[in-house]
């Protein structure tokens, strides 16, 4: 992934966080556990987080919980 595409993913992740607030921050924190933030994710992890946030937005609009959508994962185990 080149630097421009990477920055585009980071920008969209920030957009989702600003628009939806805490629910999106929860998913971002889950993906970045043990790291300094989205910028520290590997390319595939960054792309996965962006995809998860797109799905999370759909869930919020459709009234589907993140648990039911499989977006919340166990941290240990």
Locations of the language-model features?
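A short, exposed loop/beta-hairpin motif centered on an aromatic-Gly-Thr core
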Residues: 36-42
